[in-house]
Amino acid sequence: LKSVDGFQDIVIPSWCVRSSEEGKTGKAAVLETIDLTPSKADLLRYKETLSSSDAVFIDYVLGMCPNITAGSLFLGSFDLASAMGDPLKGTQFGIPYVGEPVKFSGWYKYTPGAKFYDKDGNVVEGQTDEFAIYALLYEAKGKDGKEVTLTGTDINTSEYIVLKAEVTDKTAKEDWTYFEIPFEKMNDKEYDAANQYKLALICTSSKEGDRYRGA
């Protein structure tokens, strides 16, 4: 709880990505899907105490803030200017990569949240959340010769994806679970050492987090 200019009981949500000392060996990243509706409700109440000019900023924050947000880690960059116009374009996946990846491996644990919410903050009865952990190799140059950078709009659908490795068992795992997955060909493409590529790694606590759905 926090006081803002004398206004009590603002709900401050926890971070959706944080560090933990309880990794398989050493530290681990904890990804969590966070319900932001209590915080948004408190901001609406706080807005009523402000002048009309100050309330404009609260309206802006509420307009940008989804009802739920999924914790995620990815290899790439985040472009704030692009995100202001289209949040999905803010996540720019991948870094230059030389060579053909063979396997994708690591350790994870997973516990789905108790309630699954849609983008409007409504509970979806009977639906269980699922995580996503996967890696992609994609062509760094398009047919027109220009640089290609996949974003949240096309990371799963782009014709430039060449190889993909994904954890497909998305059930709950109480203990640390190892995965080692071979990369598979996508879009009937073959790896060509003469081409330029980018490698993207994506981990998220809710596979539908890009659509603001999850638990």
Give the location of each predicted region:
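Short amphipathic, basic-aromatic surface patches that mediate peripheral association
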Residues: 108-123
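Aromatic (Trp/Tyr/Phe) and Gly/Pro-enriched flexible surface segments
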Residues: 1-105, 126-206, 210-215
